[in-house]
Amino acid sequence: MSSTHPGRTIRSGATQNLSGTIRPAADKSISHRSVIFGALAEGETHVKGMLEGEDVLRTITAFRTMGISIERCNEGEYRIQGQGLDGLKEPDDVLDMGNSGTAMRLLCGLLASQPFHSILTGDHSLRSRPMGRVVQPLTKMGARIRGRDGGRLAPLAIEGTELVPITYNSPIASAQVKSAIILAGLNTAGETTIIEPAVSRDHTERMLIAFGAEVTRDGNQVTIEGWPNLQGQEIEVPADISAAAFPMVAALITPGSDIILENVGMNPTRTGILDLLLAMGGNIQRLNEREVGGEPVADLQVRYSQLQGIEIDPTVVPRAIDEFPVFFVAAALAQGQTLVQGAEELRVKESDRITAMANGLKALGAIIEERPDGALITGNPDGLAGGASVDSFTDHRIAMSLLVAGLRCKESVLVQRCDNINTSFPSFSQLMNSLGFQLEDVSHG
């Protein structure tokens, strides 16, 4: 499918069934925010279960560059010595956020109000992703941000300045846009308000409240009071529902499967994928429901199910935006047709995820009609042909989704350019193989 150098190539093949218990990778969104708010708080923040993927490590490096002491105590355990809202120092180098759109957009908001100059950049993929959606509202607050294409593309040069509070009606439901404005509002006197067309994930609000900020939430509206007194916290990061979605779908589509996924974050702004899979007839049960650090958590038991095609309600899209690539796999192996609509945001992720999944699954024998805002997928419960080499477009979620599809292919599948799996799920192959996957790294052979 691609003449581009294949990079890390992984083979995936059919398996009899999946069984066992795993804890998926730690939540990436919460890990990023733990570092950010730990740095801005007074005193020490102790984090357990931090995701040590490349995206979060970039955030840690950025704050170390700005003078914050962040000590790695053990695997996933960090101590952050917060210096308060005005304690960051001007970085002596460009802040390279790698592949992380979350880190770049959130830091854009934070750095806009700092009394120094900074530059944010990233890899080729990140430099092609839209940044105007955060630059525009920040500019309304008085931010001075310059970038390519009129400030719409990174690298971004930020000349920190005193900001003014605003009320911003966001045209899209995006936690990254909302969080960038909230972070700018932290260092801004008065109340900053964001109104969204639908509720986006709320990890920023939950964590800020835990750190001591005054945050008011009313439906789709969030207001932050500037200059809060943030205090260091003890944080335990749950498993990421976005990471759990891969073994979840794998078990649902593989006959005889019965697995348990431990300690998965059940934040209601993130459980859209559960709603979609349950609507298809998925056998997913929540066990041991509890709350950890202000976030709902549960263990999930997932069993093979004869899935049925559904029509997506566009209002669920913001709550499942990162899980749609693997949802496409579930739809391709369901009975009947599935219509994905209202998901045009997928086109401006690490790749154009609609085209990437449509091309990849069609190469494996699936029937997919691409639409501007989604796709019409005609499922085949008997499985796919496979026997192809497909491109992940260096997108971690595309790579993992196509590897899941390989479980139900008659011939094994080669997925190219899988290197970026390390951004969100470094232990993916090891954990999936422990459940019964047949993943093999064939990069050198």
UniProtKB/Swiss-Prot annotation:
- Keywords in alphabetical order, please: Amino-acid biosynthesis, Aromatic amino acid biosynthesis, Cytoplasm, Transferase
What SUPFAM superfamilies does the record point to?
EPT/RTPC-like
Give the CDD domains listed for this entry.
EPSP_synthase
Task: Give the EC class as a word.
Answer: transferase
According to its UniProt record, the EC number is: 2.5.1.19
A GO molecular function term, named singly, is: 3-phosphoshikimate 1-carboxyvinyltransferase activity
**Which reaction is recorded as catalysed by this protein?**
3-phosphoshikimate + phosphoenolpyruvate = 5-O-(1-carboxyvinyl)-3-phosphoshikimate + phosphate
Q: Does the keyword Cytoplasm apply?
A: yes
Q: In which residues is phosphoenolpyruvate bound?
A: K28, G101, R129, Q176, R353, R397
Task: Write out the pathway annotation from the protein's UniProt entry.
Answer: Metabolic intermediate biosynthesis; chorismate biosynthesis; chorismate from D-erythrose 4-phosphate and phosphoenolpyruvate: step 6/7
Q: Which residues form the signal peptide?
A: none
Q: Where in the cell?
A: Cytoplasm
Could you say which residues bind 3-phosphoshikimate here? K28, S29, R33, S174, Q176, D322, K349
Active site residues per record: D322
GO annotation, cellular component aspect: cytoplasm
Question: What segment(s) does the record annotate as region Disordered?
Answer: 1-24
Tell me, which GO biological process terms does this entry list? amino acid biosynthetic process; aromatic amino acid family biosynthetic process; chorismate biosynthetic process
Q: Which domain of life is it from?
A: Bacteria
Q: Compositional bias (Polar residues) spans?
A: 1-20
The entry's function note states: Catalyzes the transfer of the enolpyruvyl moiety of phosphoenolpyruvate (PEP) to the 5-hydroxyl of shikimate-3-phosphate (S3P) to produce enolpyruvyl shikimate-3-phosphate and inorganic phosphate.
Query: Which HAMAP family does the entry link to?
Result: EPSP_synth
Protein family according to the UniProt entry: Belongs to the EPSP synthase family.
Name it: 3-phosphoshikimate 1-carboxyvinyltransferase
The organism's lineage is: Bacteria, Pseudomonadati, Pseudomonadota, Alphaproteobacteria, Magnetococcales
Q: Which gene encodes it?
A: aroA
